[in-house]
Amino acid sequence: EKVVFYTQRSNGELAFLLEYAETQGCIVLDDMETYIRKHLFDAIQINTQLPKAELLVAAKLSKGKSLNWWKGIAMGLNKPMETDKLLMDLLAAPASTAKNMDKDVWKIFTAEVFAMIGKPQTEQPAEVLAQTVMDAIFDGLVSNQISASLLSIYHRCTSRHDMDAMMADYIARYTRLKEADPLKAHPDHPFLALDHALFKRLSHAIENGEFLAGYTQYIDARIQSRQAVSYKAAWLKDVKTIVEFKNGELYKVASLQDFATYYRAHFAVLDTAVRHLYAAWLHDEKWLRPFQYLYEQAEKELLDKWFALAKDYQPSQQGLLKEKLSGKGRIAILVCDGLRLEIAETIYQQAKSKKSNDYAFAMLPSVTENGMSA
């Protein structure tokens, strides 16, 4: 059985104990730096120029590492401390990360963290340091002036579902949103409040007849952000649909059949978008009204076309139900107005397996109390 004796006495004071220690050799640790440099040279034949503090930290972090790892450290090709990994650990579990870290490693780690966020180093509890880091990241996202390293850390945080609860806490404790410009923020930002502010600014711009290209470009970037999936407003894509919608192909509609095809293929998405905005903003009529106005303009063009064609309507659907029910296979019959047709069409377009559809006509369209075509 192997036994290790540890003592702080000099060799001359060990007396008979030295005989036991010398059985397998005596390791003198009163000069740890010299000991590490000597054994490192014996192992890899490299005289490293690492400063003492960094060398000691490397030794403490070397457990489980290979000689190739040590070669990279000794030659200055790699840093002994994986700051990004340790920072992710800190953000995910501040208290346990600090508790399990050697005090010398913690000191160098915190120095590198403060350098990364561009702030003077101060003594902080782990939880406060973690919030300080996230506040720096949020500041960079809000101003769209964030370093590549901090943006990478943020993306790693948003991609980890086990950090969702921690991220929600960090976001809730961030207090510098009041003066933020929603159009200047990085599109990956995690603030639903900025999406609401953007909606209100766009509403005001529509009401005043302003140029909207800058808004739609930003909204498009926000919609496409994969990192903001859990944080952005679901209705942003509906805002884009309403603002950009044009009845460009309506002039080609020459029959009721053309009209039905046009509605399903082109106009139904606008009805869907407005329905989603009503669900989200119906109690904020002031901000919703300009978007409703855009919708009503497009709807009027659609209804004008319908009434122009309806006078030529001739019944052509006698026996339609009997004909369809006589077919083989499973048949679904939906009796609905245009609003429900729009919902059904949305579901149909999202279905993986497309089935054949036939549509019957009502005599006249209707308009709901909120102005939706039906």
Identify the function of each model-found stretch.
Residues E1-R330, G338-A374:
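…; additionally, a secondary subgroup of soluble metalloenzymes is captured
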